Amino acid sequence: MIKSAVHPLLASLPPTYYSIPLKNPPSRSFNRFFCHSSSSSSSSSSSKNNNVKKSVQDPYFPPRFSVAPMMDWTDNHYRTLARLISKHAWLYTEMVVAETIVHKQDNLDRFLSFPREQHPIALQIGGSNLNNLSKAAALANSYNYDAINLNCGCPSGKVAGHGCFGARLMLNPKFVAEAMSAIAENCDAPVSVKCRIGVDDHDSYSELCDFVYKVASGSPTRHFIVHARKALLNGISPAANRKIPPLKYEYFFGLLRDFPSLQFTMNGGVTCINEVDAAIQCGAHGVMVGRAAYNK
């Protein structure tokens, strides 16, 4: 899909929206990608108890290939299997709600521990309460995740509806910037945002740029994982939200051009390694695969 479509998309990019420097842009080349080889140790004890050295180096480069955080899929068992298959792919946890971390401090290992062999691994958290997001990041810090990601893309009714977080956070970029600042202040790992290209009728390229600009200029966030579909918050299922909204890769490649000091990982509709390679060749800093990582 991507291999045949991505070059025409590049030729039809939207007009430049924000080609302005961000506050304190990182001074590093994006031609290089960080690649970490997992530990050869056979120990299965948690990273909290073993003071595992982090796989992320300074400066931080986004992973070239990663497996998306997926509820009911990317648990410890799946990640163990995935790590046996690939030593270099970045793995993500299922989303863990900030309140769960804060209110389950007597049983944090259940939600946050992982075998050291799973490095490099990122924790995805969700929430809309600044205080709880701060506390959750601080509590997770001792588990030595390689990155922490904020969920701004989940469209499910339970998350974006009653929970008022996930994709709904895209409607409030000021809050997202504050949340990312709070998370970054309470952890040692790099931080990132996973988002859609829009929400409901707020789906123009200029609105997407406004979100990215406000979050990046108001927080330490320099890495965005962009699912190239908008989210529909009209009650349809998460599965339908992965199929009904059309993919708009031109939005993703527009961000690459208009925000040269930021890092962008492409997500959505990627089904094979040839499509991953095509996206990288066309400038994507990284590619995240979701359903294809368990369907094939």
Regions found by a protein language model. Name each.
Residues 1-23:
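N-terminal chloroplast transit peptides
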Residues 9, 13, 30-38, 46-296:
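Flavin-dependent oxidoreductase catalytic cores
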